[in-house]
Amino acid sequence: MARGCDTLFAESVLAVQRRCPELRLVAMIPCPSQPDAWPEADRARYSRLLAACSEIRVLEPSYSDGCMLRRNRAMADAAALLVTVYDGGPGGTAATIRYARQKGKQILPLWY
């Protein structure tokens, strides 16, 4: 989970989960140190979300080059549908959308 849309989607899942308890929130964490440089308020929000997850998958024991990309690919591999918020610029979201398309994943763009 990252700041921004990932956090908003996670909070939305938890809100819907109150009415639909079979819904699960699974966090894909690239490495345990992911939030270390974030502002305190964001780290606290992240901790609350992790505590509410049905499952937490930590992909690597420590930060390394490419760990965010590998996390994004793991999320795409695990997803039946990718819901994307994307501004058209280069970066991790663009790479993940390209990867998902190559894998034949269904993509629902909310903003493109």
What are these regions (language model features)?
Residues 1-112:
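Acidic/glycine-enriched connector segments
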